[in-house]
Amino acid sequence: SAHGIVAIGALALCKNTSGDNNTAVGFCSLVCNTSGFSNVAVGVCALLNNSTGQENTAVGFKAGIATTTGCGITAVGMCALHNHTEGGDNNAVGMCSQFSTTTGAGNNSMGHKSMELNISGTSNTAIGEQALRRNTTANDNTAVGKEALCGNTTGTNNVALGHKAGKAITTKTYCCIIIST
């Protein structure tokens, strides 16, 4: 049997069999967890589908809801990392931040809808509302500022600093744009 379990809310951690050191607060939080360990889920349906994932933190309504086997994710905000299934080491802070990320790994996003449409892109950093919003499969981009690189879909190794910096870039690689307003 599992040790170190805290479950508050209807169906919270109800399927847990051997996962140790899990905390679930909220209706259906960590409901599908069976053997995943060291997870924290706070909010209605937070980490709902996690079964064997470990060392994940999800705070907010439906944060990390689709995660099944992912490890080391942090999702803070309503629907942050919503579609995430198995990628690891993603950090998403803000409503709908990395909403569509399924298998991408090593991404860091902060801001409302930052990296919202990312699917499998890896090692990206987006800070600011809608920064890198349309990124789908691109890797190694850094966008800092509201709407920085928000139009980028597949361009890699880009750096954009400032409000709307590189907003029109969609597929270019190795661009560096700095806008000061």
Predicted ranges, named:
Residues 1-181:
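Glycine- and small/polar-enriched repetitive beta-structure motifs of secreted/surface proteins
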